[in-house]
Amino acid sequence: MCVECKACLDVCPRMPANTKSIISSDILGPYLTVKNVRSKKNCGRFQNGGAVTALLAAALEEELIDCALVMGEDRWAQKSYPRVVYDVSDLEKCAGSKYTSNAVLEPIQDVVKNVNNIALVGTPCTVQAVGLLRKSSNEFAMKLAHKVRFLLGLFCFEAFSDQLIPEVTRRLCVPSWRIDKMSAGDATMTVTLRDGGMKTIPLPEISGYVKPGCKACADFTAKLSDVSVGGVGSTPGMSVVILRTPEGVGLFKIAEERGFIEAKDGVKVKAIEKVGKLKLERNGF
């Protein structure tokens, strides 16, 4: 029931007054440093260097957070869903990229009733909403934002609806349970099967399954996060990690000092800017 608190207007990333910090020619957004990062631990079926899973594992094991709000996956149906994880074992089950997108913020109101500090992982649209919660002076918004200790953003050009999976299985003539993981790059969706086989689909052929909301998003690198992570511009086998805030740097240093991650320089920043600019221009900003 609406109580006319106006919190929704205060934090909506599609309101013109709220878009200035999101839409700009500065593709990377504000940041302190950029690194190539690889997990030093076996953290499950991670994507690229496994940086997100490793950072969250460090936060959980060092008791910096009570839980993490991430995207889980029904591996039989290949459908994603929001999941709250309280330990590293459950976290590892959620490792890896999901190309179908669902409302990761859906459980947050219930979660914050029982814990003090959470980490949240999301694509730029999710990060925009939580980032604006943090900036808001609205009482209701502040109650939620205060509980988000770490906000981790994922590079995202676009996401797909759940209807993508039936289309992929139809095109490849395989049931959904045979799919191990999917990855997108170079205008191609690569599907890795459980038996090690690989199949590909040109991305333009499945563009009709892109979520409509993605066309209203200008942010590729999740500018309002504490830490942004992605594969574009990285050294092979590693993730790009953009550290934006002192909180993000603190988490990174703890993870590095405790042996969860290793890092090195050499990120191809221009490659990130190229893809970010393409998204900005494609979506009409």
Predicted segments, located by residue:
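Entry/capping segment at the start of metal-dependent catalytic domains
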Residues: 14-52
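A short alpha->loop->secondary-structure connector
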Residues: 135-153
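Portal/gating segments that form or line small-molecule/metal binding sites
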Residues: 46, 51-60, 64-113
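Long, compositionally biased charged/polar accessory segments in the mid-to-C-terminal portions
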Residues: 63-66, 169, 173-285
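Cofactor-cradling patches in redox/metallo enzymes
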Residues: 107-113, 128-135
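Iron-sulfur cluster-binding cysteine motifs and their immediate structural context
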Residues: 1, 6-25, 227
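Short, conserved secondary-structure transition motifs
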Residues: 153-166
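Gly/Ser/Thr-rich loops at beta-strand to alpha-helix junctions
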Residues: 48-51, 75, 120-130, 158-160
